[in-house]
Amino acid sequence: MFARILALVLAILMLGSTAYYLIYMLVISVAAETPLYYTAANDDLNIRVGLMYGDGVTESFETTTVHGYTVGVQPLQDGVYTYTPFWSISGNRVVVAADKNLTVKDGVYSAAKSTDAVYVGGYHIEFHTDYSIADMAAAEQTRQNLDAVLSASGMYAFPVYKNGVIRLRVGSFSTEASAAAAYPYIAGIMSYFVSEIAAPSETSVTLLDAESGRILMEYDSSDGTSLGLSARDTLSAENAYIKTPVQNVYDGVMAYTRYAEEGIDGVAVTNVLTLDQYVEGVLPYEISSTWPMETLKAFSIAARSYAAYTLGRHDSTYHFDLCNGGHCQLYRGAGRVDRNVKDAVKSTHGLIITYQGKIASTYYSSSCGGNTVSIGDVWGGASSPYLVAHETPWERYSEYTNGFWTVEISPTELLNYLREQKGFTQLKGYIADISVLEYAPNSTYVKKLRFTDAYGNSADVVNTDKVRSTLGAYLKSANFVVGRGSVTYTLDKVEIVGERVIDSKTQKHVLAPVNAASAALSSAGVFVQTANSLESASLASSLILTDTGTVSAGSAPLYVQPALGELVSLAGADAVSTPSGAIELPRTVKEYTVVTETKTASASSATNFIFVGKGWGHGAGMSQYGAKDLADLGYDYEHIINAYFTDVEIVHYKTIPALDR
């Protein structure tokens, strides 16, 4: 009888409470101010980046943020990746854990070994309330009213997302038996709803307050979606981010999915964000943001192109596009993003590199040592016409910490390494000889290397990156010479001898008009013809607008938003000189000459092998340090890109049908 009276009171509260309206407005307003990532609503491409996956998952994952979180549904498998927020929480430190009995030690949540050690129980009483996510405000009102009734018992209610609807759960029990004992009382409170005991699920995750261990929500991802968390934004100028315990800071949405396969059970974490946000999180971890702006622009375009080319690489296995490591591109989020990074990415927004209308695979490495290598010689297989070997005489590799190196190895040490670490068990005695059988065509990279032991047994290594990885404990690239006791090598040094003026061609990429009233130029700069000269206005924060959707001299007024200042109206003689195609502007660059010295390096023992090498990495495509050297000489990003990739074009990714690769 008591339970039925409580149920009636609760129903009246649900129907008549003013708090319902207030909470509804709160949830709606929070959702409205939260940054969303709808591909259809902006010009950005949303991508998925794996942060924790496969055997790297843990049973729980903690994050913090300043203003709390927005909670939503994040699809990872529908090809759209539209984040739909439906709730918010004010806590600024949360944990997402596998749905199971949990214990906590030193702030880390993990599976409890026994019921005696349970801190957060995995069994609950579930009510089939079946609210839609659009009715989350009503679900929240019911939850709060239910909490008021349960307060004396020490239990509380929380929502669970399950197959597209929101249900309510009560309690945190360590066993089914303890849940069953509490069931009659709890089920009787809302007897007008079907209820049941909910056991831990291998498709669910639990959202916890990190400090108290209180369950905030549970999420069952069996419908192919994931629990999405994004940092709640504020009206301040500072962006809101999510931070991990290792102090990496992330933009966009963090998507959590239960991963339970092949004896591994934990929480997979995927960062869903725009392509440009991703590029911002790659650039300062691959190169320094203090490098010249033209280098940053060139790298932004190369990184964006590589991401577009490899999009979906891990989809079939893990349901994300790219990993966050060197296998794809080194991505660590927004922690190092500064004004230079933002300007470089924004001024090249959407630009990618293509070859004959298809996205180019824009490989890059730290430095090449004065020569790149064709992609077919790196890993084998067919070569790409735009990834061929080039001399790069402008590269100051000898001035870089890892650009020029010397390594000495004893014959016995090398034998043990090759046998134990690399599996060359056919080698029986100390290494007596190392022979370079073949260099990659038009390159100084070693393509085929032979090791011969004291008994005449030999082992061959083919392809430049296999050569590099085989000796990876010692060498930084396959661009080397080797000798026993000593070796002769060449060393190049760049010397500036003067300056010259060149024509720098800058492409103008015109996007489709918006509402038939504006046109945006996506390029490094907008060139404005003033009364005195042709000047460049940065497109880092520029929109080019006209009344007709076209840009032409002497017609409708042209509005230019410079990086700083008010919107400026230009007309007549003060109009953009060319709306599309290429224009030629004078650019002063430094002239240089290369001085080559021939030297000899000697080992400490006449029996030891000595390697002298240049460059760091696989050597295909663009050299990061080489791109810096070209910018230091005065060249722009287009020249840099064309110096490393043959016969390519720079276009907006939206001009490529279905990201044709």
Enumerate the language-model features and the residues they cover.
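Conserved, single-site charged/polar hotspot
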Residues: 3-661
